[in-house]
């Protein structure tokens, strides 16, 4: 089995590429980073440091790479069985054009084999978004063939992969936590679900998408925003602060109650899931910088993202949400001169005040009780 994977960064190599390779899938990475592509082509392997209760180094083999702006990647799409991505939500619309060119050439070559495409991104229904972008670049005459032969499979992915350590001179080595979760919507495949160890299938993907978004993502960013306020440098430092740990756990319990009401998750099992995530944040082998997790606050404050979406759920079900509100207030306190979104957010705050800024970026009514509570909390945070 062959796969083309867009994005040879840490998540691509340390998570999706490794899972595929471990199941004997021949992986071709596609990326714009020329030195990275050249090194992958030369070595055709790389090391992954897997850290949990212990540390082990695995070697991923039988991989290669092409430049994602070249004709090579289009030719690879013609003959591949699977396309996956880990490029970041903002890059999907860029690679969609390349995928559309590859599909066009595939159809022109009369390749009738089914092809499945899976976007492995930190966004809800990311592959559906990618599909819409691909179809916008695909000639109308090919839409019916695409509907018949190409599966656009939504997924939920979860693995903490921090940036590589600066002291490491191995361009390809990547560090990942031992925990990983890759869940796919089995209803969207064409030609059956491939047998890939580490890729779990479900017929109720949204339950798992929101479980991850409302727990891992919500807890992670609140840890970062509260940690930034207290001067912590890493997620581990922040979550070992007893006050922050208590508040992060409470926020995940508030969002967790939404999940329990909405999807019927078992209360005790979900409590154990929260504890597991708190343990992951405290992993001594991971140096996960606060600024990596806190960056792009505007995206994270979107109404369908990790702070506002669970808050809206608490409003829907009449659930306590005071700690989620504090996490949202802390996000508006985040200052980082090297992050354009953080700069934009602080500029808007200075020019328009909190309530107007809150309404502008989150969609919350500035006269709502939640907005008033967030404003009250905001004024108490230093």
Curated annotation (Swiss-Prot):
Report which reactions are catalysed by this protein: D-mannitol 1-phosphate + NAD(+) = beta-D-fructose 6-phosphate + NADH + H(+)
Q: This protein's superkingdom?
A: Bacteria
One GO MF term on file is: mannitol-1-phosphate 5-dehydrogenase activity
Going by the record, the broad EC class of this enzyme is oxidoreductase
Q: Which GO terms describe its cellular component?
A: cytosol
Identify the residues that bind NAD(+): 3-14
Q: EC number(s) for this protein?
A: 1.1.1.17
Q: Which InterPro entries match?
A: 6-PGluconate_DH-like_C_sf, 6PGD_dom2, Mannitol_1_phos_5_DH, Mannitol_DH, Mannitol_DH_C, Mannitol_DH_CS, Mannitol_DH_N, NAD(P)-bd_dom_sf
Stretches assigned to coiled coil: none
GO BP of this protein: mannitol catabolic process
Keywords of the record, alphabetical order, are: NAD, Oxidoreductase
Entries under NCBIfam families matching the protein? PRK02318.1-2 (NF002646), PRK02318.1-3 (NF002647), PRK02318.2-2 (NF002650), PRK02318.2-5 (NF002652)
Family the entry assigns: Belongs to the mannitol dehydrogenase family.
PANTHER family in UniProt: ALTRONATE OXIDOREDUCTASE-RELATED, MANNITOL-1-PHOSPHATE 5-DEHYDROGENASE
Q: What is this protein called?
A: Mannitol-1-phosphate 5-dehydrogenase
